[in-house]
Amino acid sequence: IKTGEVSGYNDVGQVMFKTLANTVNQKEVIKLFKKNIVKNFGPGSKYWKNLSLRKKYKKIKWKTAMKGPWIHQNILETIKNIKLKKTITGGTKVNESDGYCASLPFYFSHNSDQKTKKIIRTVANGKISEQFAMAKLKIIDLADKGDKDPVNTFLRKNIKNKYFNNVIENIKKVKKIKSKPHNFVVKKFGKACSYPGTFNGAIHAIITSKSFKTAVIKTIKAGGCNCSRANF
């Protein structure tokens, strides 16, 4: 298997990471992030050059992997909205992980929920995308601080938090079938990139794995949009 290339999801996160690393005035992060999104994914980029091939692949039954990178719907909409000079530029047609990936390096360097939500909405302007992204960040934060069972700790801390109602219900659904094989669980909740399926599949991998490596291998084997799940 050829390795060395990251997914479009991870690339969004890397664009934010590089933006943060090269920004002196933190008030300009969103402005510069938008500029870098267009530079990395827009006209002239390897993603943009693959647009016609992407359109073809959406119409046919896949037999082999598409050569080159795949630009996400959220990013296509974001680039369009940036050019239209919209205040909130994120995509609205899908509920996927772009917002989470963009916010991951930002959240851990700023630790501000309000500012993080603005970052999420910069590339994924939807309530579902925001809520699940914030939940993932909170769970990772718990693990980063040494919590041995971050998923259950998050559940306990937010059981009465209305903002996370949808997230809590989905974690409970996953826990009910924790003993089932991972491939079965991913197929049941959905292999596609969208929430809540991508979140549920990742949660199952986390709570049934003993290490990061085994969780990622399990995630890859389950197929579908394993990149969005593995980035969590």
Roles of regions detected by a PLM:
Residues 1-232:
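Structured, active/binding-site neighborhoods that engage oxygen-rich ligands
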